[in-house]
Amino acid sequence: GPILVQLPPHWSVNTGRLQEFLKAAPRSLRWAFEFRDPSWLCEDVFAMLQRHNAALCIHDMIADHPRRITADWVYLRFHGDHYSGSYAPDMLKAQAQWIKRQLGDGKDVFAYFNNDAQGYAVDNAKQLKRYVRG
């Protein structure tokens, strides 16, 4: 599976450092980047990721996070509200429809749940899988 590079919440955009990393990173691996500071969510970063077939991790830690596809595969991460709480079935069904469209376009989709403070992650992952296959 892919390797996730998660940046700290208050580490602002540094395209030079990202470029250095991407040039040094083995291209045989799938790299996903979870940016938690909104300054990273810009066209320069998206283009850089795309040139290296690295995925922008689409997550729910930043309000209105863009669903920008930067690779020939997709990386989704569901954190929940402060890493807890269960996702509502309607939300998971909507996510499943979006995932189905990506799969239909020939993309691999990786979806991870991190809302495990009360143990909901496994149940939510099973629900999402059922909705995608259903």
Where on the chain are the PLM-derived regions?
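Residues lining hydrophobic/aromatic ligand-binding pockets adjacent to catalytic sites
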Residues: 1-134
